[in-house]
Amino acid sequence: MIDSIVGTIQEVFNNYVILNYNNIYIKIFCNSTKFSEFLGKEKRVYVSLKFNENLSELECYGFLTREERELFLKLQKVTGVGSKLALQILSSIDYQQLIVEIAKGNVARLEKVKGIGKKTASRIILELKETLKKEFKVASTSGTEEKTYEKLEEISLALLSLGYEIDEINQVLSSEDFSELSLEDGIKLALKKLSKI
């Protein structure tokens, strides 16, 4: 299975780019707005290969980070969400912000994405909310009190909304004891630690 491809972003179109890999030109469906910043430049693209609906053609979907690709794959596990709609969602909402919105249960925000109604938005939140909350924050131990667990969750979501990477957040939250701190002080401490990474 191909994990990623390094090549030059040769051309940018509405919902895909052409990537030049050793003079082999690959069509990659993606968030073309993000990829347009790298037109003419060499870039590593994390890919996911999928057969189209007719099973007649293998399509390549590309992302700038491994985390965004993983979220793309998770979205497709939701009933009624295929590759095209999953990409549409990630092209409309930054993947880190999308994690926050799903974790918060923000149906209204998801409904704003073209092609998503209330039913699909609700299903996405129902099926992914707990999974994302567990995966994109430090896991609690058996002795951790519920209040501390919730506090770490809120700190994680706050830092995600500020644009910090998930791996960095987990590193900081697992290296400090936040149990005696208020939410505000916890966020301040986390930001201080993140500035040193």
From Swiss-Prot:
Q: Where is this region: Flexible linker?
A: 144-152
Which gene name belongs to this protein? ruvA
> Does DNA-binding count among this protein's keywords?
yes
Q: Which InterPro entries match?
A: DNA_helicase_Holl-junc_RuvA_I, Hlx-hairpin-Hlx_DNA-bd_motif, NA-bd_OB-fold, RuvA, RuvA_2-like, RuvA_C, RuvA_C_sf
* Residue ranges, annotated region (Domain II): 65-143
| A GO term from the CC aspect | Holliday junction resolvase complex
- What organism does the record attribute this protein to? Caldicellulosiruptor saccharolyticus (strain ATCC 43494 / DSM 8903 / Tp8T 6331)
| Name of the protein described by the UniProt record | Holliday junction branch migration complex subunit RuvA
* Matches recorded under SMART domains: HhH1
What subunit structure does UniProt give?
Homotetramer. Forms an RuvA(8)-RuvB(12)-Holliday junction (HJ) complex. HJ DNA is sandwiched between 2 RuvA tetramers; dsDNA enters through RuvA and exits via RuvB. An RuvB hexamer assembles on each DNA strand where it exits the tetramer. Each RuvB hexamer is contacted by two RuvA subunits (via domain III) on 2 adjacent RuvB subunits; this complex drives branch migration. In the full resolvosome a probable DNA-RuvA(4)-RuvB(12)-RuvC(2) complex forms which resolves the HJ.
Q: Molecular function (GO) terms listed?
A: ATP binding; four-way junction DNA binding; four-way junction helicase activity
Q: What is the lineage of its organism?
A: Bacteria, Bacillati, Bacillota, Bacillota incertae sedis, Caldicellulosiruptorales
